[in-house]
């Protein structure tokens, strides 16, 4: 391939390459080494907790649900647990990897938030929100998750605020099915469901304040808290 040079003989930079590099630089968030270690450690712990959660939920479904419902619960709980593992693993890798490797895992990390939201809904759709209403919610939430992931994959950090709004909006779409959930879930399970949503939402405030030191680590802790609440909501749902 012929080398492109400027009129003065210096190497020219391909406009497309320059735009790509600029996008990558704008995406990479300026965390200190201490912050990145804390970010990686917190969600590394989340990976371990997620594996435990997946095992406990599946074991409970196998041993304590009626035979005709077992498959539905196992699949729903498996999707939820797997989405937790994927989210926390990708987040840990993103914060642990060297700066030059962050871009791809950063995009995957943010897309995994959509996966976790949809995975959480899936567990409820297959267990508590069965029937037409369950499949409607399932289709809507996965459609939004796929759309959000594609948008973020194409535009990256430039649509960070749009993604944040979508995360919150998708999470609180649950208000449209709050009545059947309230009627079908034990009170303690419904309480944990709501508490999980509140923790995720409060955590989004710290996510938005990324220019303030340590706020991203605080966001991570709120995410873990929300995940724990939703684990207990599902575990105590029957």
Curated annotation (Swiss-Prot):
Transmembrane parts of this sequence: 39-59, 74-94, 103-123, 131-151, 161-181, 188-208, 218-238
Homology family: Belongs to the UPF0073 (Hly-III) family.
Protein's name in the database: UPF0073 membrane protein TP_1037
Sorted UniProt keywords: Cell inner membrane, Cell membrane, Membrane, Transmembrane, Transmembrane helix
GO molecular function: pore-forming activity
Superkingdom of this protein's organism: Bacteria
Stored InterPro entries: AdipoR/HlyIII-related, Hy-lIII
Gene Ontology cellular component list: plasma membrane
Localization (cell): Cell inner membrane
Pfam family, one: HlyIII
Main location class: membrane
Membrane topology recorded in Swiss-Prot or TrEMBL: Multi-pass membrane protein
Keyword Transmembrane helix appears in the UniProt entry: yes
Lineage, top ranks: Bacteria, Pseudomonadati, Spirochaetota, Spirochaetia, Spirochaetales
């Amino acid at each position: 391939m012929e080398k492109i040079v400027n009129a003065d003989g210096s190497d020219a930079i391909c406009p497309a390459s320059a735009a790509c590099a600029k996008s990558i630089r704008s995406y990479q968030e300026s965390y200190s080494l201490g912050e990145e270690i804390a970010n990686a450690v917190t969600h590394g712990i989340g990976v371990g907790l997620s594996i435990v959660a997946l095992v406990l939920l599946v074991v409970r479904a196998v041993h304590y649900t009626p035979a005709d419902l077992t498959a539905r619960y196992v699949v729903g709980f498996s999707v939820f647990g797997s989405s937790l593992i994927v989210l926390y693993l990708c987040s840990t890798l993103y914060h642990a990897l060297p700066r030059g490797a962050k871009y791809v895992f950063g995009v995957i990390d943010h897309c995994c938030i959509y996966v976790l939201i949809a995975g959480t809904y899936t567990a409820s759709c297959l267990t508590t929100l069965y029937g037409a209403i369950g499949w409607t919610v399932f289709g809507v939430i996965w459609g939004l998750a796929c759309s959000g992931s594609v948008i973020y994959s194409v535009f990256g950090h430039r649509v960070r605020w749009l993604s944040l709004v979508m995360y919150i909006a998708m999470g609180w779409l649950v208000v449209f099915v709050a009545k059947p959930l309230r009627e079908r879930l034990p009170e303690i399970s419904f309480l944990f469901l709501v508490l999980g949503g509140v923790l995720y939402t409060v955590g989004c405030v710290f996510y938005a304040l990324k220019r303030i030191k340590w706020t991203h680590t605080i966001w991570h802790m709120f995410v873990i808290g929300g995940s724990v609440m939703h684990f207990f909501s599902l575990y105590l749902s029957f």
